[in-house]
A protein has these predicted regions:
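Hydrophobic h-region of N-terminal signal peptides that target proteins for export
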Residues: 9-18
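Positively charged n-region of N-terminal signal peptides that target proteins for export
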Residues: 1-7
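Extracytoplasmic copper-binding redox domains, predominantly the cupredoxin/blue-copper superfamily
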Residues: 18-226
Length: 226
């Protein structure tokens, strides 16, 4: 009897996982707001254009993440990502938004011939890497899902964000807003969109085995008027 149960367990564990794809598009909708004056403070938390960029130069898709915010068994998770980094270069953070699954480590190399001091006061992860010069790096592990806004004590115009997601099923939209998450185990999920300044949107979806689930997000972003 024990051997029979063991055999059944092995068959079940080795069975292929039925999976489908999530495909969709993010449409940006604009609304006029009064032009804001942003003072030299960390209060905006990413609401202002990053690193002094003009609004028309901002890559809004690069500031957007789409991910499954639901529990997925370890047997169904994706392979770990290579080490991600946010470099300090030309008094800017590159990249502006990095996405990692919970438990991942991110490095912060200083490639400027000046000191930087990277820090965050976010609820998901609070840290202060201290002052360090060109050629050195610091690493931090991010265990709790959620957005982590990153700044520099010495250069208030520098800001970036790390979006820590609960699993490996995430993506960022392409240049026209299209996105795809493939190989998702069949089931019901909460699909969330996060934007660096606009926050969260979400949809409840059902992924069928070997099928495609279509999703559309309308992302409201403000356009300042003179």
């Amino acid at each position: 009897m024990g051997k029979l149960l063991l055999g059944l367990a092995l068959i079940i564990s080795s069975a292929p996982i039925l999976a489908g794809d999530i495909e969709g598009i993010v449409r940006i909708t604009r609304s006029l707001t009064k032009k804001r004056v942003v003072v030299d403070t960390y209060a905006p938390r990413g609401g202002a254009p990053a690193n002094g960029a003009a609004p028309e130069d901002i890559d809004e898709w690069g500031r957007t993440v789409v991910f499954i915010d639901s529990s997925i068994s370890p047997a169904q998770t994706k392979s770990p990502l290579p080490l991600q980094q946010i470099a300090q270069r030309n008094r800017r953070f590159e990249r502006e938004v990095v996405v990692v699954p919970a438990g991942s480590t991110v490095s912060f190399p200083n490639e400027d011939p000046i000191f930087h001091n990277v820090f965050s006061l976010s609820k998901s992860k609070s840290f202060d890497l201290g002052y360090y010069p060109i050629g050195q790096t610091r690493k931090i592990q991010f265990d709790k899902p959620g957005p982590v806004q990153v700044f520099c004590h010495l250069h208030p115009n520098m800001n970036a964000a790390i979006m820590v997601v609960p699993n490996g099923y995430f993506t960022q939209p392409a240049s026209r807003g299209e996105f795809k998450i493939d190989g998702v185990p069949a089931g019901r999920y909460t699909l969330r969109l996060w934007h660096k300044s606009a926050g969260y949107l979400q949809e409840e979806i059902e992924v069928s085995a070997e099928g495609k689930t279509q999703v559309k997000f309308l992302l409201p972003l403000a356009t300042s008027k003179p």
